[in-house]
């Protein structure tokens, strides 16, 4: 899971030389770079924050050449104070410009600069400004990801998400522009919003705050006990501030209520009678079940679900109102109940035709094929509705990898069937058969380099490597959804149930 630069270059701290000396638990401060034990090995890490919990001081460390998801709160005992610490450089004061004067409040026509005297921005400035104000199409991101194969393949050969900003890789042109856009948005938007402004700006897209600084917040929860699993969050989640002082918080795996005290949690578990998500069971096959939960009818449960998922989704922003959303939760059945594996949400009435607003597989169940089940189930529902579905854009790094794999496998399987029958096929036919939008089909074909222009005609070519890969994947046992076992009809909602509940 390490996600640093390809050459192993340092990714924490600035390139300027730093003062080095020994430190103590009392003198070390935010911004220092120290040696911290991780997985039994000493690693260079920058201390981003310090807090005091019930067990003592803890330090939030960003490890060198590791993805941001692997940042963690560590106790004092894991810091090596026998080695020198790199101290942060003092901030340089900006030199004052003696020529700078206060601009007059009212400028007369005589003092206004003429058009000739105004400096014309350079081509670089013009292009940067226009690109920053114009969002990049998803196609560029797909092609950019396809070129950066080395950045998406881990040391064990499995696909891993490594954002250049998070992991410290050298960003490409598209990545630089993406960062510039974010910085521009942060400068343009106020740091905080009032409740009224938040409501006005809140986008109905399953995504927990409109504040641009929320995404970059330091993770506030160190450890979560969820059923029989101990989870270590990846990102900040807006739980009550008092929970940040706890070494571990306890979350009921059925009702998703959260507690900071073990005694209170134990008392709750004795009284909690819920053994499955509070909704209608739509699908049951072997050990897998799917439940549909209406955000309007189960507000508390759905809000708790959003808080839980925010710890593992960087850009999830839905929290205030869950009324306009339906939540589809996948569970694994045991003798003790139905344990949540993952979920996806969708708008009751999507103006853009999205069939998924937010999707998550719980960390303890990742890399086991459950993510594919969630994606397949969302498309099966779209097929029953008679619609073409697509996830909300832009996708996260892990989401893009999962969807691209699903799209590739299904499109390839569909095309191989036509090839064996020696029949012609169109993009519209692929889209209708797989309940995918034509845009997603085209993007996938382009990413796989399967769409070519030959003799004044567009053709689809299947490379030999993809055929060989298909034969290998056939040998693997995959989890799939049986469409015949889905007991569901598209729900019909009143106008009030499709809107925000304020």
From Swiss-Prot:
Q: How is it modified after translation?
A: Autoacetylation at Lys-316 is required for proper function.
Zinc fingers (C2HC MYST-type), as residue ranges, are 249-274
**Could you tell me where this protein is found in the cell?**
Nucleus; Chromosome
GO BP term, pick one = DNA repair
Q: Which GO terms describe its cellular component?
A: chromatin; nucleus
Domain named MYST-type HAT is located at 216-490
Which residues does the entry assign to the active site, renumbered to this chain?
Answer: 392
The source's domain of life comes to Eukaryota
User: Could you tell me one molecular function GO term of this UniProt entry?
Assistant: zinc ion binding
Q: Is-annotated flag, keyword Transferase?
A: yes
Q: What is its EC number?
A: 2.3.1.48, 2.3.1.-
Which residue ranges traverse the bilayer?
Answer: none
- Region Disordered, annotated ranges: 1-24, 88-194
On whether Acetylation is a keyword of this UniProt record, the answer is: yes
Q: Where is the composition biased (Polar residues)?
A: 142-151
Which Pfam families has this protein been placed in? MOZ_SAS, Tudor-knot, zf-MYST
Q: Where is this site: Important for catalytic activity?
A: 358
- Short motif ESA1-RPD3 motif, span: 299-320
Residues that bind acetyl-CoA? 357-361, 366-372, 396
Reaction(s) catalysed by this chain, per the record, are: L-lysyl-[histone] + acetyl-CoA = N(6)-acetyl-L-lysyl-[histone] + CoA + H(+); L-lysyl-[protein] + acetyl-CoA = N(6)-acetyl-L-lysyl-[protein] + CoA + H(+); 2-hydroxyisobutanoyl-CoA + L-lysyl-[protein] = N(6)-(2-hydroxyisobutanoyl)-L-lysyl-[protein] + CoA + H(+); (2E)-butenoyl-CoA + L-lysyl-[protein] = N(6)-(2E)-butenoyl-L-lysyl-[protein] + CoA + H(+)
Please report which protein family the annotation says this sequence is part of: Belongs to the MYST (SAS/MOZ) family.
Q: What is known of its domains?
A: The ESA1-RPD3 motif is common to ESA1 and RPD3 and is required for ESA1 histone acetyl-transferase (HAT) activity and RPD3 histone deacetylase (HDAC) activity.
Q: How does it assemble?
A: Component of the NuA4 histone acetyltransferase complex.
State the protein's purpose: Catalytic component of the NuA4 histone acetyltransferase (HAT) complex which is involved in epigenetic transcriptional activation of selected genes principally by acetylation of nucleosomal histones H4, H3, H2B, H2A and H2A variant H2A.Z. Acetylates histone H4 to form H4K5ac, H4K8ac, H4K12ac and H4K16ac, histone H3 to form H3K14ac, and histone H2A to form H2AK4ac and H2AK7ac. The NuA4 complex is involved in the DNA damage response and is required for chromosome segregation. The NuA4 complex plays a direct role in repair of DNA double-strand breaks (DSBs) through homologous recombination.
Protein name per Swiss-Prot or TrEMBL: Histone acetyltransferase ESA1
Whose protein is this, by species?
A: Gibberella zeae (strain ATCC MYA-4620 / CBS 123657 / FGSC 9075 / NRRL 31084 / PH-1)
Lineage, top ranks = Eukaryota, Fungi, Dikarya, Ascomycota, Pezizomycotina
